[in-house]
Amino acid sequence: MAKDKKDPTILITNDDGITSPGIRNLVEAVKDLGKVVVVAPDKPQSGMGHAITIGKPLRFDRVDLYEGVEMYKCSGTPVDCVKLARDKILDRTPDLCVSGINHGANHSINIIYSGTMSAAVEAAIESIPAIGFSLLDYSLEADFSASRKYARIIVEQLLKSPPDKHCVLNVNIRIETAVDIKGVKVCRQTYAKYEEDFIER
């Protein structure tokens, strides 16, 4: 389906890489809601936080993974992806930046380390409202169907009623079927931290 020039532009990125199941499900969820442009790392970049590439070339290449979706893989971090999209790839400021769907939770201190959430924060710094989606499942067989459904619902709502241009939403979706999820609850970030264990060799 051809996109009208008035259709909203949705920038999609992540930190798990351009071939990850999370970004594939996110693209499938929202690709008919506007002009979707994907700029994502060419390899996993989890835990990169707000890092940017300095001192070496930053490259991006067009890839064709999903029909009708403009996609680019980037050699840099998730934040690099947002910066490149804004300055070199997109011909206008996107209406929304959507990051994810992350393979694992992003809450409490995780959001500081998370490339998924840092990409969303970078977008908001650049006056692009943003959402970071995460599935609370770390298994290799994670089922993204419920997160795909709720990602679409939330993106649709924000396109209809745009938030402040510096708004960032952090959405964590439980490991349940779409039928079992009763709705969306807005809450503050919890306080928690990891107990690290270093192995000396």
Segments and roles (model prediction):
Residues 2-10, 21-88, 92-93:
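A cross-family phosphate/adenosyl-ligand binding-site feature
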Residues 12-19, 110-111:
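Short, glycine-rich nucleotide/cofactor-binding loops
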Residues 13, 39-41, 99-102, 133-134, ...:
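Short beta-strand segments
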Residues 85-91, 118-129:
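Alpha-helix C-terminal capping segments
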Residues 96:
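Short, Asp-centered acidic motifs that coordinate Mg2+ and/or phosphate
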Residues 105-114:
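Glycine/threonine-rich flexible loop motifs
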Residues 124-146:
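Glycine-rich phosphate/pyrophosphate-binding loops
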Residues 145-201:
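Electrostatically charged, flexible surface regions
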